[in-house]
């Protein structure tokens, strides 16, 4: 999860913070929406790779060491972590730290509620924990985007120039993230 978040921060969030403030509010929202769609595509790719990687590893090392049922919750946790991270960065970009605090409070509350439910149901295992993280991340991310007013799937024009500029900024950060890890 942390490696996926670091790569997405380098490829998307850092360019968003560098590019968006240079424009007026409407263009800034359009840039951020286009970058969100790009980040969503990257997250789906990372989630798919995580899903297939867990299944392949489970098959090789045995289901006892790494159950294949871990694949779905982990892949969804990658998507939830991404949604929450993007909502946080966008709220910080808009200089709304109270919304970031509300988003983090919601996330932590949902994770703790899910873990408490797992303990109460005597069902607390790896799949349950990743499921709690996924659910909390997706809920907090959706709430955060809704609160900031970003509509990433609306019409925001063509994104080629934004993607080109983001790649020009992010391509140098990705190798440093890989080396750091």
Report the location of each language-model feature:
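Hydrophobic faces of transmembrane alpha-helices in multi-pass small-molecule transporters and flippases
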Residues: 36, 40, 71-75, 98-105, ...
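Hydrophobic/aromatic residues in alpha-helical transmembrane segments
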Residues: 12-16, 53, 87-88, 114-115, ...
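Membrane-interface junctions at transmembrane-helix termini in multi-pass inner-membrane proteins
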Residues: 79-102
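Alpha-helical transmembrane segments of multi-pass membrane transport and lipid-handling proteins
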Residues: 36-63, 73, 113-120, 142
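Small-residue-rich midsections of specific transmembrane alpha-helices
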Residues: 1-21, 78-83, 174-181
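Transmembrane-helix boundary and interhelical linker motifs in polytopic inner-membrane proteins
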Residues: 4-38, 93-98
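Alpha-helical transmembrane segments of multi-pass membrane proteins
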Residues: 44, 48, 52, 63-87, ...
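Hydrophobic alpha-helical transmembrane segments
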Residues: 67-75, 101-151
């Amino acid at each position: 999860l942390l490696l996926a978040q670091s790569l997405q921060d380098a490829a998307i969030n850092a360019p968003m913070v560098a590019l968006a403030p240079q424009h007026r509010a409407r263009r800034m929202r359009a840039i951020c929406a286009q970058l969100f769609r790009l980040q969503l595509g990257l997250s789906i790719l990372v989630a798919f790779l995580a899903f297939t990687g867990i299944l392949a590893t489970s098959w090789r090392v045995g289901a006892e060491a790494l159950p294949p049922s871990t694949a779905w919750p982990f892949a969804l946790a990658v998507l939830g972590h991404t949604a929450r991270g993007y909502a946080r960065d966008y709220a910080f970009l808009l200089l709304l730290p109270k919304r970031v605090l509300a988003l983090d409070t919601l996330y932590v509350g949902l994770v703790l509620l899910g873990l408490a439910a797992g303990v109460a149901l005597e069902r607390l295992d790896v799949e349950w924990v990743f499921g709690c993280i996924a659910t909390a991340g997706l809920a907090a991310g959706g709430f955060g985007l809704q609160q900031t007013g970003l509509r990433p799937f609306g019409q925001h024009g063509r994104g080629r120039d934004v993607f080109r500029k983001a790649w020009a900024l992010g391509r140098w950060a990705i190798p440093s993230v890989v080396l750091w890890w």
